[in-house]
Amino acid sequence: MKISLKCLNTHTAEIYRKCLLLSDSTVNVSSVDFTNQSKLNLLKQEKKSIESFNKNSLLNISNFRDLERQEKDIQKKTSKKVYKKSYSRSTKSIYSRTKIINERNKLHTLNQQIIFSTLARIHLKKKINLLFPVQEFLFELSKHRNKSAGSKSREYLEILLCVKKLKMFYGFIPLKQLHKILVQAKAMPGYFSKNFFSLIEKRLDVVLYRSGFTKTIVAARQACRHSQIYVNSKVCRIPSTILESGDIISYKNQLDSLKTAEIKNNLFSNINTNVSGNEVSNNVSNKVSNKISSTLALNKQSLLLLLFCAKSIYNESFFVSNKRKFKSNEVTFDNKKEITSAIDYTKYLQIKNSRKKYKLITLNNNLDSLSFNIFDKEILNSLSSKQNLPVNKQNIVEIENKKTNKFNTFSLLFQNLTSFSKSIESYSSVLALKLQDHLLNIKGKRNEVSKNINKIERSQKDNVFINILQKINRPTHLEISSITNSIIFLYSPQRIYLPFYVDIDILRKSL
């Protein structure tokens, strides 16, 4: 039995039309007939579902697919919010790492499959129709592998280490100056490494270090900053100046530090320039000795103390004598080239009595004197052979040991010097304190006197070898004169020995 829509209620007909519009079905409303009551029940259910939606939304929507899209968008927005809440930063980082690792593994497996397949075909000698040979293919594939993140980090590390090594080797050059040299070396024709080293070795501070005038490059820079170095007779305060062939480098003359020209004239007035070198040295030495004798007359008391503190402490050739002719605080400059002094002091010397027959020694309370030699030859002879106190110039009983049978002068000398330091305190307390400090060190240095003499003899022999080594290790790219304290720069060195490995061509990539 066919039922037309006209027989139904008007409300049900409207619902059916809206359903047809939503389902995009092309059906004539007039031709539709409901054969069973089940269809009516379906319409009622659809009615309830449609009424649940908002009326405004149903009027605006013309297609059921648009409604589905809107629902999906709403679900995505809600799902994103849930994702942010559920995952923390640590889980995100782990998730991203796992993604990267999986992608790398996929690429690695693909590359392995390609390589093994090609190698298997080559081994089986099967023909492969490729645009280019297999070796080129494998070579290009290796290039793509090296362009990964790990290879880039290694290159950066090598560049950084290379820069640090060069900075430390050349006295911690600033990065700006090093970058300038690299740019200049790149612009120059020829090899990059040769240009780089030739430019660095032309720097003023490096040249001073190579010449041997300074111990370090930092000391050379300090000398430049203190305006102690001249380049072509002009003050140069910039240590990074690049020299050219023929430039003359010289130190500041010590005579320039003198304020007046009169002092200079007085120094050079007594020297005859027309005489030969040996005669000049003799004339100068005689006139210097005359000047010293004139200064001795001015400051006799201070000179006595200075000579005593400087030379008498390490000399064991002292002798005590009773000379009642001299007065206190008097100095005489005899023809025998000896300085003698007479100082008032009352002292006694105690030596312990024991089974080894030590005796008690007393000194007369008269004006005694200490005498010592000035010149080095006599001092060395006295140090090499330990002299006992002379018998004629003393009123002291000799002490003998059973083991050595020698006179022990050290204890007597030490106690005489302590009393002498006490007598000086009224005159100058500073020198007395210095002398007391030296005396404390003498006990440890008693046996070192003979060792020092051997060192002096060895040093004289070693100086010969040092001079030979200096001639061998003298740089060939510089003309050095120790007499005038000047250097002539000829050219940059042709060979440089580095204590480490450096690949300077890597630095070219960083530019």
Swiss-Prot record:
Q: Name one Pfam family in it.
A: S4
Tell me yes or no: is Isomerase among this UniProt entry's keywords.
no
Q: Which PROSITE patterns match?
A: S4
Gene Ontology molecular function, alphabetical: rRNA binding; structural constituent of ribosome
Annotated localization: Mitochondrion
User: Per its UniProt record, what InterPro entries does this chain match?
Assistant: Ribosomal_uS4 (IPR022801), S4_RNA-bd (IPR002942), S4_RNA-bd_sf (IPR036986)
S4 RNA-binding domain boundaries: 202-272
Tell me its family: Belongs to the universal ribosomal protein uS4 family.
The name under which this protein is listed is: Small ribosomal subunit protein uS4m
Give the organism the record lists: Prototheca wickerhamii
**Name of the gene this protein is made from:** RPS4
